C-alpha cells in the first residue's frame, strides 16, 4: 500500500507514516577491500519520531532498547531515549543539561554520577546507583547590566530532576550511593501510588538548596540613589505517591526541603538528622536630597522557610545520635508520628528579623525666619518561627535530653514525650523595639503668642521609645487521648501548656519544675524646650492708656455741641495720649534692659 521496495530509501512522507522503529535495506554504493566499488543493500535504521525525542539543538541516541557499557566515562549533554529500556553502565557518568528517558532506566557507575541541570525520566522504574557519590543539582546562571540602572541576577537555569511518571503499578525510584547523595534544588517525583521512592547514602544524605539573588542600583550621585537586593532559595523536593524512604549511614541534612509521601515516610540516619531553615532576605536602601527636603531610608526583612515533612500515614524519624529540627513542620493525615534519637532531640525555633530606619529633614526659609524639622524613626522585630508536629498520635523518645522551644505538638490520640535525662518544655522569645525622635528648630522673627514678637532661636525636641518581649510557649496536647511526660532526671515546664481535652495527663520525673513566664513592655516619652532671644510686646499699662486715649477721642466727638464739654474732652484726650506715649517708652526701655 505504501509502495515499499527493498533497496529504495524511504521518502519523508513514508517516514512520517511509521508506527514503529524499523530496519530497512537501502541500496548504496560501497567500497570493497581492493578499492573497487559496487552496489549493495545496506541496513538503514528508521526511527519513529515522538514528542520529546529530539529538539533543534540536541543530539539523539534512541531505540527500542539502549544498552551502553563503558569502562571509562560517559558525558551526555543530549537526548538518550529508549522505548523499553535504557541501561548505562560506566566508570563514571556525567549527565549535563540533557535528558534520559525510557520505560525503565538504570544508571550504574563504578565511581560517581553527576546529574546537573538534566532530567532522567522513567515510566515504571528508575534506578541510579554509584559506588561513589550521586549528585543531582539544578544549575544557575548570573545576568548583569550596567549604566544608570545596574542590576545583577542569579537565577535557576535548568532544573535537575528524577521522575517516575507511571501512576499505576509498583513503580520504583531508587537512588543509592556508596558515599554521599546530594540534592541541590533538585526534584525527585514518583507518581506511582503503590511505589517506593528511596534515597540511600552510605555516608551523608543532603537535601540542599541553591541560593538565588537579585540586586538593583539606581545612582544619580552619592546623595541620591535607590538600591535593593533579594536573596531567596530554590529548595529540593522529594515527593512520592507511595512510600518514601531517606536513609544515611552518617548524617541526614535537610535545608528547607519539601518531602511528601502519599503513604508512609521514613527518615533514618546512623548519626545525626538535622533539619534547618533557609532564610530569604529582602533589603532596600534609599537616599534623596533636595534644597528643602532630605530622606534616608533603609529596611531589611527576612522570611524563614523551614523543612516540611508530610505523609498520608505514618512518619518515622530515627537518628543514632542527635535529632535536631528547626522551624520544621511535620504532619500526618491519618497516621502517627514517631521521633527517636540515641542522644538528644531538639525542636527549635529560628529567629526572623525585620528592621527599618527612616531619617528625614524638612527645611523652610524666608527673609525673616527659618524652620527645620528633623525626624528619626526606627523599628526592630525579631520573631520566633517554631516547629510543629501534628498526627493521629505522637511519640518522641530521646536517650538523653529532649528540648522543645515553643514547639506545637498535637495528636488526636496519645501523645508521649520521654527523655532518658532531662525533658524541657520552654518558650521561644520574640522582641520588638521602636524609637521616634523629632526636633523642630525655629530661628529669626517668630510670633510670641500675644501682641509682640520674638527675635531668636527656639528648639523643641520629643523622644518616644517602646520595647516589648513576648513568648511563644510549647504546647503538648491531645484531642482525644492521654498525654505522658517522662524524664529520667528533671521535667521542666516554663511558660508552656500541657493539655488533654478528653484524657489524662501523666508526668514522671525525679524533679518537676513548673515556671510562669510573663510578657513585658516598656515605653518612655521625653520633651525638651529651649528658647533664647529678644521678645518685644506691649505692657498692660500701655494697653490701658492707649484704650483710654481712644475713648477720650471718641468722647470729644460726642461733645461737639457743647463748647465746655468740648474743651474738657480735648484736655482729657491730650492727657491720655501723653500717658500712653510715656508707658510705651518705659516698656521699650525695660525690654532693652532685659
Model-based region annotation:
Residues 1-594:
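Binding/recognition "hotspot" determinant
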Amino acid at each position: 500500500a505504501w509502495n515499499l521496495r527493498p533497496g529504495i530509501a524511504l521518502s519523508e512522507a513514508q517516514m512520517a507514516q511509521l508506527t514503529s522503529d524499523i530496519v530497512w535495506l537501502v541500496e548504496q554504493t560501497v567500497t570493497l577491500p581492493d578499492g573497487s566499488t559496487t552496489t549493495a543493500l545496506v541496513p538503514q535504521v528508521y526511527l519513529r519520531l515522538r514528542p520529546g525525542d529530539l529538539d533543534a539543538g540536541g543530539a539523539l541516541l534512541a531505540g527500542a532498547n539502549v544498552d551502553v557499557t563503558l569502562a571509562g566515562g560517559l558525558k551526555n549533554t543530549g537526548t538518550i531515549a529508549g522505548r523499553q529500556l535504557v541501561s548505562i553502565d560506566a566508570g563514571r557518568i556525567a549527565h549535563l543539561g540533557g535528558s534520559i528517558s525510557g520505560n525503565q532506566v538504570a544508571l550504574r557507575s563504578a565511581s560517581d554520577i553527576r546529574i546537573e541541570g538534566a532530567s532522567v525520566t522513567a515510566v515504571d522504574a528508575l534506578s541510579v546507583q554509584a559506588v561513589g557519590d550521586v549528585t543531582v543539582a539544578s544549575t544557575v546562571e548570573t545576568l548583569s547590566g550596567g549604566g544608570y540602572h545596574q542590576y545583577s541576577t542569579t537565577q535557576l537555569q535548568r532544573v535537575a530532576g528524577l521522575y517516575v511518571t507511571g501512576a499505576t503499578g509498583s513503580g520504583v525510584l531508587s537512588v543509592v550511593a556508596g558515599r554521599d547523595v546530594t540534592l541541590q534544588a533538585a526534584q525527585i517525583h514518583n507518581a506511582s501510588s503503590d511505589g517506593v521512592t528511596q534515597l540511600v547514602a552510605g555516608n551523608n544524605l543532603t537535601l540542599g538548596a541553591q541560593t538565588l539573588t537579585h540586586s538593583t542600583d539606581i545612582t544619580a550621585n552619592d546623595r541620591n540613589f535607590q538600591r535593593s537586593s533579594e536573596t531567596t532559595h530554590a529548595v529540593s523536593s522529594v515527593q512520592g505517591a507511595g512510600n518514601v524512604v531517606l536513609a544515611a549511614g552518617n548524617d541526614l541534612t535537610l535545608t528547607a526541603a519539601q518531602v511528601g509521601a502519599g503513604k508512609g515516610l521514613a527518615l533514618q540516619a546512623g548519626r545525626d538528622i538535622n533539619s534547618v531553615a533557609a532564610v530569604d532576605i529582602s533589603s532596600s536602601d534609599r537616599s534623596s536630597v533636595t534644597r528643602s527636603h532630605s530622606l534616608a531610608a533603609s529596611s531589611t526583612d527576612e522570611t524563614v522557610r523551614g523543612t516540611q515533612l508530610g505523609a498520608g500515614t505514618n512518619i518515622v524519624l530515627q537518628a543514632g545520635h542527635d535529632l535536631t529540627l528547626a522551624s520544621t513542620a511535620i504532619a500526618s493525615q491519618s497516621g502517627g508520628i514517631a521521633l527517636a534519637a540515641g542522644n538528644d532531640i531538639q525542636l527549635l525555633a529560628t529567629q526572623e528579623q525585620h528592621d527599618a530606619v527612616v531619617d528625614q529633614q524638612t527645611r523652610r526659609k524666608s527673609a525673616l525666619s527659618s524652620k527645620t524639622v528633623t525626624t528619626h524613626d526606627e523599628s526592630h522585630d525579631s520573631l520566633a518561627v517554631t516547629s510543629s508536629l501534628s498526627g493521629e498520635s505522637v511519640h518522641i523518645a530521646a536517650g538523653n535530653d529532649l528540648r522543645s522551644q515553643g514547639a506545637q505538638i498535637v495528636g488526636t490520640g496519645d501523645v508521649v514525650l520521654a527523655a532518658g535525662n532531662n525533658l524541657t518544655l520552654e518558650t521561644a522569645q520574640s522582641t520588638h523595639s521602636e524609637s521616634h525622635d523629632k526636633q523642630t528648630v525655629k530661628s529669626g522673627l517668630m510670633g510670641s503668642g500675644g501682641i509682640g514678637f520674638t527675635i531668636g532661636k527656639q528648639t523643641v525636641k520629643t523622644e518616644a521609645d517602646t520595647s516589648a518581649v513576648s513568648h511563644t510557649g510549647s504546647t503538648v496536647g491531645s484531642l482525644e487521648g492521654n498525654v505522658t511526660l517522662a524524664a529520667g532526671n528533671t521535667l521542666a515546664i516554663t511558660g508552656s501548656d500541657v493539655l488533654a481535652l478528653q484524657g489524662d495527663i501523666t508526668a514522671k520525673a525525679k524533679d518537676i519544675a513548673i515556671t510562669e513566664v510573663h510578657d513585658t513592655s516598656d515605653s518612655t516619652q521625653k520633651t525638651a524646650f529651649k528658647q533664647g532671644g529678644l521678645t518685644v510686646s506691649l505692657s498692660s499699662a500701655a494697653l490701658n492708656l492707649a484704650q483710654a486715649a481712644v475713648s477720650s477721642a471718641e468722647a470729644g466727638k460726642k461733645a461737639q455741641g457743647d463748647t465746655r464739654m468740648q474743651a474738657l474732652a480735648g484736655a482729657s484726650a491730650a492727657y491720655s495720649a501723653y500717658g500712653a506715649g510715656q508707658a510705651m517708652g518705659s516698656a521699650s526701655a525695660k525690654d532693652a534692659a532685659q
